[in-house]
UniProtKB/Swiss-Prot annotation:
Residue ranges, annotated region (Disordered): 45-71
Keyword Lipid metabolism included in the entry's annotation: no
Source species taxonomy: Bacteria, Pseudomonadati, Pseudomonadota, Gammaproteobacteria, Alteromonadales
Quaternary state and interactors: Part of the 50S ribosomal subunit.
GO terms classed as biological process: translation
Summary of the function given for this chain in its UniProt record: One of the primary rRNA binding proteins, this protein initially binds near the 5'-end of the 23S rRNA. It is important during the early stages of 50S assembly. It makes multiple contacts with different domains of the 23S rRNA in the assembled 50S subunit and ribosome.
Family named by the database record: Belongs to the universal ribosomal protein uL4 family.
Protein name per its UniProtKB record: Large ribosomal subunit protein uL4
Keywords: Ribonucleoprotein, Ribosomal protein, RNA-binding, rRNA-binding
One Pfam family per UniProt: Ribosomal_L4
Gene this protein is translated from: rplD
InterPro entries named in the record: Ribosomal_uL4, Ribosomal_uL4-like, Ribosomal_uL4_dom_sf
GO cellular component terms listed in the entry, alphabetical order: ribonucleoprotein complex; ribosome
GO MF entry, a single one: structural constituent of ribosome
Length: 201
């Protein structure tokens, strides 16, 4: 199959298995959920009454004071006491096979092509790290909510896009399923398309 280059009167020959496969919604959902889960730290930690520092001594005698009976000062109803159902450190990570991960990326890319949301250009760069310059370039192409994918890290482009709302710059190695579906349009250079094909082959 062919992808038309927006900035040149030519087309780029690409693999049907990468850019023309059927959309597998269940697979994409599973991979996106796993990706988000793997980004979680899971480092929250609270103490139960057994773990709180403090005395185990009975604060006052059982009878005769007129106060409610109490067996200790570390219970959940006491200030400084433990938490009833204390949150513990948790590993939220989910295993995703390489084949599934690549399959999800292919599915997303193919759907972007079908919906005309994947824009391929010969090259894309800015002369200086100026947001104004990048904004003007995107406006000329009628693009706002866009993910720019390049073959390698472009420092000028990254710095120019950093302060723009709903604009992000990634190299092929930094591509992930969440960023691909988070933007309305994905702008990819021809070199990046070839790298994506090699990566997902």
């Amino acid at each position: 199959m062919e992808l038309v280059l927006k900035d040149a009167q030519s087309a780029l020959e690409v693999s049907e298995t990468t850019f023309g496969r059927d959309f597998n919604e269940a697979l994409v959902h599973q991979v996106v959920v796993a990706y988000a889960a793997n980004a979680r730290q899971g480092t929250r930690a609270q103490k139960t009454r057994a773990e709180v520092t403090g005395s185990g001594k009975k604060p006052w005698r059982q009878k005769g004071t007129g106060r409610a009976r109490a067996g200790g000062v570390k219970g959940p109803i006491w200030r400084g006491g433990g938490v009833t159902f204390a949150a513990k450190t948790q590993d939220h990570s989910q295993k995703v096979n390489k084949k599934m991960y690549r399959g999800a990326l292919k599915s997303i890319l193919s759907e972007l092509v079908r919906q005309d949301r994947l824009v391929v250009v010969e090259s894309f760069s800015v002369e200086a790290p100026k947001t104004k310059e990048l904004k003007a370039k995107l406006k000329a192409m009628n693009l706002e909510d866009v993910l720019i994918v390049t073959s390698e890290v472009d420092e000028n482009l990254f710095l120019a896009a950093r302060n723009l709302y709903k604009v992000d710059v990634r190299d092929v190695a930094g591509l992930d399923p969440v960023s691909l579906i988070a933007f309305n349009t994905v702008l990819v250079t021809a070199d990046a398309v070839k790298q994506i094909e090699e990566m997902l082959a």
